[in-house]
């Protein structure tokens, strides 16, 4: 049985005066799914989020929430009727209302006096870990506490979709990690779908069900974090998703490419040209044989060693090209040592 998407965006285009900021955006989001819109500042990800919320009006395209059209030709459902939650960078709580009444505002009246509303508010405060803060006002809260209250307010009316615009960017690194984990856990437990805007690659790799890579108003690729990291469709996506080694290469056959390092097995299919570039991740290289059949074997020479405590970074030169390898277990090695270097996993060839 095929489940209908919770959200469907079709061929969305948006202009600010003569500048096009969204180019033919199309994607869908399943119920309970968490999607991260990942890209550099100014790439269009916040504009896309605001268009879904109803704060920005696209020039063309359609937005569907389940089987209900919320934006289309000559039709734009007002934001307050879309039944979506929205959380921005700094929470934006009402300073004259305490935590309880800020959350109650999410239910529509800001009072939360009847028994059903009280029960719902208490459930949400428990879920987001702010039950003990009910009587405090925003100025009495830390940045992380304010973000939890903002999420609680967005979850209060039980929306099926929550939109979050870089909700952790204003927090310091230690607090950001803690609040991020707590808020993601609360979202998972609530059963709501969510779309996050972020420029933090590591954050999206760690927490997303799917990631949409956005560049200059276009979605380059949307897929699971693992697929985007290890099997991206485009070289630019591959480089954006993590540290990479990119070398000119020639295709020897459909399974092998030749580059400065040597002959590299590749896993791409349907390659149209013989000349291109090969991409490898540094973590594919190891000084240890971690499997019976490594993908490839090279001879290398140690050029630099950097001890970092639990790991040691080692610069190895292979056929005149230097790469850095991080080893969790630090062997007794010296600069100038010659040793075998193992490659694990196949490379990616881009014509």
Curated annotation (Swiss-Prot):
Protein name per the record: Fe(3+) ions import ATP-binding protein FbpC
Function text: Part of the ABC transporter complex FbpABC involved in Fe(3+) ions import. Responsible for energy coupling to the transport system.
Reactions it catalyzes: Fe(3+)(out) + ATP + H2O = Fe(3+)(in) + ADP + phosphate + H(+)
Family membership noted in the UniProt record: Belongs to the ABC transporter superfamily. Fe(3+) ion importer (TC 3.A.1.10) family.
Keyword Thylakoid appears in the UniProt entry: no
Localisation per UniProt entry: Cell inner membrane
Primary localization class, coarse: membrane
UniProt-listed Enzyme Commission number(s): 7.2.2.7
Binding of ATP, residues: 39-46
Molecular function per GO: ABC-type ferric iron transporter activity; ATP binding; ATP hydrolysis activity
One cellular component term from this protein's GO annotations in UniProt: plasma membrane
Record domain ABC transporter: where: 7-241
UniProt cross-references to PROSITE patterns, sorted A to Z: ABC_TRANSPORTER_1 (PS00211), ABC_TRANSPORTER_2 (PS50893), FBPC (PS51242)
Superkingdom of source: Bacteria
UniProt KW Ion transport keyword: yes
Keywords: ATP-binding, Cell inner membrane, Cell membrane, Ion transport, Iron, Iron transport, Membrane, Nucleotide-binding, Translocase, Transport
Gene source species: Haemophilus influenzae (strain 86-028NP)
Membrane topology: Peripheral membrane protein
A Pfam family annotated for this UniProt entry: ABC_tran
Top EC class for this record: translocase
The protein's assembly and partners: The complex is composed of two ATP-binding proteins (FbpC), two transmembrane proteins (FbpB) and a solute-binding protein (FbpA).
